[in-house]
């Protein structure tokens, strides 16, 4: 069988099973040394490490320092705190392969310069409080993949630094301050994920990333911002469903990005929906050049009057085309500079141009 395929169900003996190295999934025993021994036993060309069903507690990070390591559970089990009655049932053995970062600053740390690491079919949790990092790619990795990962009760679910050619697919990372943080790198693909954060954090933040593809994701409340692209170029944001209680759903700075066919939904009409942004910040805020926004839908439940939905007052060549906005009560639905094109979105009297 292909070891890279999803592997569900029970098993008797699988090569690389961490319990053969002394790991005990009882929700109490520190398993970091045993699991790192399993990785150390792999040949230099890599191999497979399997986490069976159970709660494997970590007081130190699992460190992946070899190329072509596949680190996988059998299935990620229950996902949400609200799927079960009581936190003890979520953390109890059975119902999935779980890593609990009790005292580890990261449950899994992928060392700098490692290629071909695949992590899949796991739940990664901070335990009963939101602390630590779930999975941390510490620098200059290549051809990594995260698939079918649940991250919950962490400070940051996934942190990726300087990665190239990274795939993050079919992951559920919610009920924590920050779902995903990307720093540097290029050709990173986040697809078919469900992400949700808390107002002390940002759901997904990418800083200095080139060619990020953020496609077909479901982004729930309650992050301060849903997606922040800070100094990112040549990115594609397409087919996502963004839902938030706060303005600043998408905050973008950079050049030559494409934002197409997304739904942006500001809901709840909360009195604190501005946070500290101000009523001219917009649920979409753009700074940069030659960014294209085509065929997006914006639904705005404002608690205030004459609020800006889209702010593009810095940069040139930014284009908003064929976008639908349901709330046209404000006189300045768009607040843009003269270098921004707005076509087939709203009537011209709803576009306020700043000098």
Model-inferred region functions:
Residues 2-18, 343, 347-355:
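Glycine-rich, low-complexity segments
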Residues 12, 39-45, 64-65, 112-113, ...:
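Flexible, charged surface loops at secondary-structure boundaries
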Residues 18-52:
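Acidic Gly/Asp/Thr-rich repetitive segments characteristic of extracellular carbohydrate-active
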Residues 36, 43-89, 97-104, 124:
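N-terminal extracellular ligand-recognition/capping segment immediately after the signal peptide
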Residues 47, 59-61, 80-84, 101-107, ...:
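Short glycine/acidic-rich loop motifs that flank beta-strands on beta-rich extracellular proteins
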Residues 64-67, 115, 140-143, 163-167, ...:
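Short "repeat-start/strand-capping" segments in structured domains, especially the N-termini
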Residues 70-75, 91-95, 107-154, 169, ...:
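Parallel beta-helix/beta-solenoid
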Residues 122, 149, 171, 193, ...:
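Consensus "Asn ladder" position of solenoid repeat domains
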């Amino acid at each position: 069988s292909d070891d890279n395929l999803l592997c569900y169900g029970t098993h008797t003996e699988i090569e690389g099973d961490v319990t053969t190295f002394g790991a005990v999934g009882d929700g109490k025993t520190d398993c970091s040394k045993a699991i790192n021994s399993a990785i150390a036993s792999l040949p230099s060309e890599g191999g497979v490490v399997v986490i069976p069903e159970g709660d494997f507690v970590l007081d130190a990070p699992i460190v992946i320092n070899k190329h072509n390591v596949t680190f996988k559970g059998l299935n990620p089990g229950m996902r949400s705190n609200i799927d079960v009655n009581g936190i003890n049932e979520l953390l109890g053995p059975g119902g999935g392969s779980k890593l609990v970062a009790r005292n580890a600053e990261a449950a899994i740390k992928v060392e700098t310069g490692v290629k071909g690491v695949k992590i899949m079919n796991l739940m990664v949790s901070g335990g009963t409080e939101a602390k630590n990092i779930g999975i941390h790619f510490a620098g200059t990795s290549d051809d990594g993949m995260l698939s079918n990962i649940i991250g919950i009760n962490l400070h940051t679910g996934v942190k990726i630094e300087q990665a190239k050619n990274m795939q993050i697919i079919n992951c559920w990372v919610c009920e924590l301050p920050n779902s995903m943080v990307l720093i540097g790198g290029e050709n990173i693909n986040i697809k078919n994920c469900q992400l949700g954060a808390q107002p002390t954090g940002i759901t997904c933040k990418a800083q200095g990333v080139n060619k990020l593809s953020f496609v077909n994701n479901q982004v729930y409340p309650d992050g301060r911002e849903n997606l922040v692209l800070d100094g990112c170029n040549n990115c594609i944001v397409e087919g996502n469903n963004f839902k938030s209680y706060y303005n600043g759903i998408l905050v973008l700075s950079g050049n030559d990005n494409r934002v197409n066919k997304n739904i942006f939904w500001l809901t709840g009409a909360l009195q604190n929906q501005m946070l500290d942004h101000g009523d001219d910040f917009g649920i979409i805020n753009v700074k940069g050049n030659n960014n294209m926004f085509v065929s997006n839908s914006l639904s705005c439940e404002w608690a205030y009057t004459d609020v800006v939905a889209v702010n593009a007052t810095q940069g040139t060549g930014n284009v908003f085309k064929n976008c639908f906005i349901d709330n046209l009560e404000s006189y300045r639905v768009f607040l843009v500079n003269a270098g921004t094109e707005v076509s087939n979105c709203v009537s011209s009297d709803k576009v306020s141009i700043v000098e």
